[in-house]
Amino acid sequence: MVQEKLRFSTRTLQWKCVESRIESKRLYYGRFILSPLMKGQADTIGIAIRRILLGEIEGTCITRVKSEKIPHEYSTIIGIEESVHEIFMNLKEIVLKSNMYGTQDASISFKGPGYITAQDIILPPSVEIVDNRQHIANVTEPVNLCIELKIERNRGYRIKTLKNFQDGSYDIDARFMPVRNVNYSIHSYVNGNEKQEILFLEIWTNGSLTPKEALYEASQNLIDLFIPFLHAEEENFNLEKKKHKVTLPLFTFHDILVKDKLRKNKKEIALKSIFIDQLELPPRIYNCLKRSNIHTLLELLNNSQEXLLKIEHFRVEDGKSILDILKIQKYFT
């Protein structure tokens, strides 16, 4: 009995990518395995990771359209083969890749005749087109078509509102889901006297990220969900091992920078003009700060660690990571 417990406690779980391929610019496939698992664990992990992959991975898409030539959504435009509704559906399918936060503007300015494709969209620097050949409309006559677009990064699926906006813009259904499909299967086997399982996981993405990247983000999101339970245990039971942990005292980032003196070259750093996008923060930390409306280095430095720890999913270790990054990038010495 003791030997069985020892064998179980020393087993090492391992992920492995057993197949990866690009079927098209907008369809990536990956197949992964996780083993060895105890009986029942594969189904638990499979259900959880599938839900996270399909519902909580952030994506970027076009969410709103505006043009003077559009009287209403179900109208037609002279000189354009597609109806307005068909153009909206084509814009909905455009696959975008970005690390932006919130909403940004884009536009199309096209003079016919010719085919309007995704490459004709004028995008902000932080957004990329995955497939430039995606069709939008066929302009059959020498007419000008100007369209203003809103681009947003979010998660899940959002159905358009039925009412029109006062500025004449129209919502379109927003599918922020970069993961197209997820399947999992379980292979059971016997190892000695112990029943074990292998979890097989198949992931298809739209090309804005790879299946491996999607799996990493989903795993991190799942881990973050359980962090509060770990913190609660530390607070309520005051575990002995907590004495041996390296923890950071509560401080204001700005106070530390003042003590260490802001690094200067020829001019003092304009903290307001340094955005956290430039700091190369880990995606999870970056998203935590953005969701709390912390956009610049100055806004970050004016927060104490106590205030940052109130941010959902922000951990003590994240504060240390930020300080390390600021030191590496020489914002202070």
Curated annotation (Swiss-Prot):
GO terms for cellular component: chloroplast; DNA-directed RNA polymerase complex; mitochondrion. It holds the Pfam family RNA_pol_L. One of its GO terms (molecular function) is DNA binding. It catalyses: RNA(n) + a ribonucleoside 5'-triphosphate = RNA(n+1) + diphosphate. Residues 266-333 are annotated as: Alpha C-terminal domain (alpha-CTD). Keywords: Chloroplast, DNA-directed RNA polymerase, Nucleotidyltransferase, Plastid, Transcription, Transferase. GO terms for biological process: DNA-templated transcription. It comes from the Eukaryota. It is found in: Plastid, Chloroplast. Its EC number is 2.7.7.6. Signal peptide: none annotated. Residues 1-233 are annotated as: Alpha N-terminal domain (alpha-NTD). DNA-dependent RNA polymerase catalyzes the transcription of DNA into RNA using the four ribonucleoside triphosphates as substrates. Belongs to the RNA polymerase alpha chain family. HAMAP family: RNApol_bact_RpoA (MF_00059). This is DNA-directed RNA polymerase subunit alpha. It comes from Phaseolus angularis (Azuki bean). The gene is rpoA.
